[in-house]
Amino acid sequence: MASPASVAGGGEDSNGCSSLIDPLLVSRTSSIGGAERKAAGGGGGGAKGKHWAAADKGERRAAKECGGEDGRRPLLFRSYRVKGSLLHPYRALIFARLIAVLLFFGWRIRHNNSDIMWFWTMSVAGDVWFGFSWLLNQLPKFNPVKTIPDLTALRQYCDLADGSYRLPGIDVFVTTADPIDEPVLYTMNCVLSILAADYPVDRSACYLSDDSGALILYEALVETAKFATLWVPFCRKHCIEPRSPESYFELEAPSYTGSAPEEFKNDSRIVHLEYDEFKVRLEALPETIRKRSDVYNSMKTDQGAPNATWMANGTQWPGTWIEPIENHRKGHHAGIVKVVLDHPIRGHNLSLKDSTGNNLNFNATDVRIPMLVYVSRGKNPNYDHNKKAGALNAQLRASALLSNAQFIINFDCDHYINNSQAFRAAICFMLDQREGDNTAFVQFPQRFDNVDPKDRYGNHNRVFFDGTMLALNGLQGPSYLGTGCMFRRLALYGIDPPHWRQDNITPEASKFGNSILLLESVLEALNQDRFATPSPVNDIFVNELEMVVSASFDKETDWGKGVGYIYDIATEDIVTGFRIHGQGWRSMYCTMEHDAFCGTAPINLTERLHQIVRWSGGSLEMFFSHNNPLIGGRRLQPLQRVSYLNMTIYPVTSLFILLYAISPVMWLIPDEVYIQRPFTRYVVYLLVIILMIHMIGWLEIKWAGITWLDYWRNEQFFMIGSTSAYPTAVLHMVVNLLTKKGIHFRVTSKQTTADTNDKFADLYEMRWVPMLIPTMVVLVANIGAIGVAIGKTAVYMGVWTIAQKRHAAMGLLFNMWVMFLLYPFALAIMGRWAKRSIILVVLLPIIFVIVALVYVATHILLANIIPF
């Protein structure tokens, strides 16, 4: 049987780059970055591939026998399912645990004996909820499917003998909200990696959305376009990976797969020097803009006029000014669309020298650059700007007028293309003869290259990206995750899939807005016969562009409801994917051995929890909206509906976890307290149920190709989140229902601390916020409970019965389990002392002993000194 590695795509890109970067199975160690970047291991032949078997042999055999004579498109991806030797025990364990849970519920209700009946009632309700939420999480995982793009087949089909391409157009969206919280250098590296991707330059365009309206981002984009004339041909000539210069130049010993090794050293040195100068220019932009503006403002004739911010061409910037005034401040400014790089002329433009004047030999290298556009949508206090969804919809409309590509892929500004073949990999799913026409979007896993080696706060989230998402791939497809996702433009427009689509669809102004050019572009998109084309430059077109990105264009249209990205919910990604799936579209999950995209994640605990609050709060908002999975999505498959329901209610679980986690305070009660009697049988039931869930987890680990550390980090951070971020989100939702105020959107800061010598300085900085109070209470309660338990043991060991000793042992076991789960939080409290984790290992037993001694001393004091 062929392994996934032996059948993945191969071939060369348009500049002769080898197939070393072709997509295979995703590697467990491929979230890499900087000097610590590791080679992607695993792949199809590793531990991850051996549990998967080809699922499309019959289809491939039929396609091969047909030889393409039926005129249909070829098979462009391969499907794999978990082998029966692993899948059948996995399913059996799920059913067995379900039966065990039901028996446990029945037993608890029949034996409603407890020392604290209100707590017994709450614990039973919690157990029922745990079982229900576990079932919602587990049912969609019955049929995991891995889909691998076949780049060789795509090249044979789309790369024609005359040098032209059959590839469709792609518009790439990059969104940034603030140049301070999201550093400009990150954003420009994202743009450079997009411009250098292996895709025909005349069929791709890049749009940067700047939600701050700041001149610095526009001028940084202009500088980036200049540097791209050197960087992009350099990447093509030498097959550079990754194509983000910051990430590439951090590599200690990058492997070389190009065809000109004798020129590489000199070329790399020159480009590196140019990149350093490019960074200096970016860093100097704020001061450059300020000095220029001061010069122009000093020459104004009306001294009472406000101090404007001036562009390099001597005109006033229409966006946010350094000294903000009405109509020129963040949150209130005109819409801006500026074409930084126009559409390249068709045909190969070969050059011996790059435009910067450096003597680099780019002979036989295509030096053209894709279209590059700056977009800053208009904002007005009288209109809701709808956060990221509003910015994406403005890009969607502007791109419709400029390039109107059939497919769209969006990135957060802190991500970059790690594998230049990524666009082609996604296109494999869109053009495949089986599901291509019904595929609305292709989601890639999120990978991060700035996470600490031990992944203290579970940023990699492998359980979700390598487990849950593959499971959804076997249903109607993965959910949209906000970045690294390719969309079919028609699906974003709210058009039904071909099977349900009506003939002769007429775009209406009431739905898409009052723009004739936009309505015409929708008709062209329906014909699916247009890719990126040169943009018109007449005044009418410019006015139309400014109108479609204005603050009021969405008003009284279907934008944000049935068209584009959905508004009024903090997690616009999940609800947008839900709306598209609900129309009958499917989605696909694309993994590549050398990860398609990499980004940065918040490694500071507080920043990470703020991110979780927004995600979980948005999920609850979705449940209490008309997009509730119980009532919405008329064409959702049943298990896909179950999956979305789980995504919207999971934060509620935290309330019962918090109840259990704080229950050890009962150790402080002098008398014995039993939650459930008979206690021994209760504990046995719990142990069996917990053991079974970890056996299921062990099988998931095997077919998902992750490690026990990945699994354990997921468990730990879920516990931290369940005592902090998730209850906060539930509280926000209650406030929202009472006051109609939504979840506040807080941009996750990507800035590191001033300690530039420590890559993980943010990891060791503790920023106290109110949501951490419950977690601290739980930690202190369990530390105190363990100490008191030790003290009680010392006092009562001689008189305790065996049952009492067993009760104490089980209580201690629970306390220690909670402590292990909160271990990352304890490290966070230690700050920089956490660099030596042995300190915590030594400190905790000392604290336990101190608490025990205090308890013993108090007991002696109360028993022998203070009379009653």
Swiss-Prot record:
The active site is at D211, D573. It is found in: Golgi apparatus membrane. It comes from the Eukaryota. Pfam families: Cellulose_synt. The chain crosses the membrane at residues 86-106, 116-136, 649-669, 686-706, 717-737, 771-791, 810-830, 838-858. It is a multi-pass membrane protein. Residues 36-68 are annotated as: Disordered. Substrate binds at D412, D414. Its EC number is 2.4.1.-. Belongs to the glycosyltransferase 2 family. Plant cellulose synthase-like F subfamily. This is Probable mixed-linked glucan synthase 3. The gene is CSLF3.
